[in-house]
Amino acid sequence: MEGEGLKLAAKYSYVCEKARLLKFSNDLYDYFRHGKGEAERIEKILKNLLSYDFYRRIAQLNHKEPFDEEVVSFYWKGNPELKGEEWIHNASTLIPIIQIKMHQIVEELVDDCVVHPAKISDKISNREWWVIYQPITKTLKKDKLTLGPKVELIVQNELDLDLKEGDWVTVHFRKVIEKISQKEADKLLQLTKEALRNFNKKNKQKAR
């Protein structure tokens, strides 16, 4: 369903305003949260984001439309299983920094941009929760990006999801986006590890 795919794309994209990449954060939020705004206008906004190019690539490989819900879901969290794992968000978001020398890469910025699977560990308030996740960090030699040991992080539940301890969620820019299954969390973690391995190989070759 393209209508649901458009809402899902808006849901993951609205937080990119924090990275100063997006001027229409409130428009996207109002669309998927409150049904405000025209679908045609939201689609136009989303088509101007870098993620749309990867929706198209995934859609072509799988004979679907770019805003098909399965295409958008696969791009952001690697589920359901489709062709085009090299174009999912956690792989494609690393492309712009492939040629940057490792010591110049700020892993905290990469960590914010990546979509993380995380497990709810404790409640602070309805809008703030502790989660356990594996952050993007550098190896001891500072020559590769990797997933670090599990740590706790405070995240925002701006979407007022019904959360409880033990729930699995996706986190983007320290905001909870969706509740997911443990199977989906495991898959996203696996794909993120693969994306980092591929990035490190290319970065070593190009950033000289």
What name fits each language-model region?
Residues 1-105:
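N-terminal intrinsically disordered, low-complexity, charge/repeat-rich segments that act as generic
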Residues 108-126, 132:
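Structural detector for short beta-strands of small beta-barrel domains
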Residues 130-135, 144:
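Short, acidic/hydrophobic/Gly-rich beta-strand patch recurrent on exposed beta strands
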Residues 140-161:
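Beta-strand/loop nucleic-acid-binding surfaces
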Residues 159, 171-184:
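Short, charged beta-turn/beta-strand-edge "cap" motif at the junction between a beta-strand
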Residues 167-168:
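Structural motif
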Residues 183-208:
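Short peripheral tails and domain-boundary helices/loops at the edges of structured domains
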